[in-house]
Amino acid sequence: PAGFCYNDTKSRFHKHSTPLMKTDPKILLRKAGVRMPNILILGGGAAGLAAALAAAQSAPAAQVIVLERNPKPGKKLLATGNGRCNLDNTGIAPELYFTADPAALRPLLDAVNTADPLRWFRALGLYTRTDEAGRVYPYSNQAADVLALLEHHLAQHHVQVRTGCTVRTLNQSRSGYAVQFETAEGSAETLRAD
């Protein structure tokens, strides 16, 4: 993708500095009085970041905001697979699991579609490799590259990732949800989501 290149000698994605757009299209729409839905994602781990990106891709006019408690998003993603980011496993079979009824496990494992997430990562520009045990890793074997790629695409889709936010309450009403949280600075804020 734009902003990243694969470097065979270092096996890393490198971010190129590119000037940001001076005008966010979402800001222009809001100024024009166009109401856009708000989507809040609570948690900036691997699933939260992927959900935020998928939401931004599916609803380009939506304002997508991620609230993360930690100072940086993707903390556990960086540790998965011993820092290599084990994305998937193609070698899943009932006999590999301890269960009293392996036959009951078969339909569940058959329902797992490993191709879709890998296709999604590939569309983002992530090359992968599969080891002899069927574990799928980024080609660079660096979890930090997966996080950098997600952060790059989140920025391109104008997704806000707010860190140091501790959610205090989540209330549902007819008009949506209200999330009250404390910022890293200790102030209380409320955001609404549709």
Where are the regions a protein language model picked out?
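Short beta-strand to alpha-helix junction loop
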Residues: R106-N113, A133-H152
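Core beta-strand elements of the Rossmann-like FAD/NAD(P) dinucleotide-binding domain
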Residues: G186-D194
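Glycine-rich FAD pyrophosphate-binding loop
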Residues: A56-A79
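Glycine-rich active-site loop/strand segments that organize a redox cofactor
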Residues: N82-T130
